[in-house]
């Protein structure tokens, strides 16, 4: 019994931590490569916050507004968990819809995050949706990359900090550029976790050397 539980917990750690974070980073870097103006603006914020490639600190990372906007917009477009499932604990009625106790309720996050009723031109990558000016106007229940309430993702803060730290360290040293193998637009596999249908292929250029670097894979 203990061996089965150990395997189950290990599997949860891998899928809940490693796979989700790495896939989110792939989506973010893809969007930066296909939106060079956003990539440049983010690198300028990074260079201003950590001059001369200084090691990132927690206090500085949490103050980086544009980095937060880029991460949030990518998680809107590509929520790694395409849906949330919750078990109804008691009979309830919401807007005239009766939900009996014991019913599994599914929230389709990918559809919610790409609904033009809440997100004008949802297929467009616009970090400004999450600017200080616009953020307060977002209904908290239409943006749920980590769920919400007492059952939201327990690793949310850790995951966001890992993603931001990785992005800063990578973008301090490299820029990303589309190449002929880059799939535009990106096709998604949405059975289970949201992920690219094919590997994301981009050119990786050391900062300052321009687009002549050889392609690498993400």
From Swiss-Prot:
| Predominant localisation class | endoplasmic reticulum
Matching Gene3D superfamilies: Cytochrome P450
Task: Tell me which residues bind heme.
Answer: 153
Enzyme class per UniProt: oxidoreductase
The subcellular location is: Endoplasmic reticulum membrane; Microsome membrane
Q: How does it sit in the membrane?
A: Peripheral membrane protein
Q: What induces it?
A: P450 can be induced to high levels in liver and other tissues by various foreign compounds, including drugs, pesticides, and carcinogens.
What are the entry keywords? Endoplasmic reticulum, Heme, Iron, Membrane, Metal-binding, Microsome, Monooxygenase, Oxidoreductase
Question: Iron among the record's keywords?
Answer: yes
Outline what the protein does.
Cytochromes P450 are a group of heme-thiolate monooxygenases. In liver microsomes, this enzyme is involved in an NADPH-dependent electron transport pathway. It oxidizes a variety of structurally unrelated compounds, including steroids, fatty acids, and xenobiotics.
Q: Which family does it belong to?
A: Belongs to the cytochrome P450 family.
Annotated protein name in UniProt: Cytochrome P450 3A19
Q: Which organism is it from?
A: Capra hircus aegagrus
What gene makes this protein? CYP3A19
């Amino acid at each position: 019994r203990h061996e089965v539980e150990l395997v189950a917990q290990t599997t949860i750690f891998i899928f809940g931590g490693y796979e989700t974070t790495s896939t989110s980073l792939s989506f973010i870097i893809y969007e930066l490569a296909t939106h060079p103006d956003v990539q440049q603006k983010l690198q300028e914020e990074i260079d201003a916050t950590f001059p001369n490639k200084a090691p990132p600190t927690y206090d500085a990372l949490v103050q980086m507004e544009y980095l937060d906007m880029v991460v949030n917009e990518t998680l809107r477009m590509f929520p790694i968990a395409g849906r949330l499932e919750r078990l109804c604990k008691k009979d309830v009625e919401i807007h005239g819809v009766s939900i009996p106790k014991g019913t599994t309720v599914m929230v389709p996050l990918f559809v919610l995050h790409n609904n033009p009723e809440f997100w004008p031109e949802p297929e467009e990558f616009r970090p400004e949706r999450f600017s200080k000016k616009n953020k307060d106007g977002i209904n908290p229940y239409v943006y749920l990359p980590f769920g919400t309430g007492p059952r939201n993702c327990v690793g949310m803060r850790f995951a966001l900090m890992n993603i931001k730290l990785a992005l800063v360290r990578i973008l301090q040293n490299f820029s990303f550029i589309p190449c002929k193998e880059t799939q535009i637009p990106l096709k998604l596999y949405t059975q289970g976790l949201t992920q690219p249908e094919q590997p994301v292929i981009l050119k990786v250029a050391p900062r300052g050397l321009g687009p002549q670097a050889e392609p690498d894979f993400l």
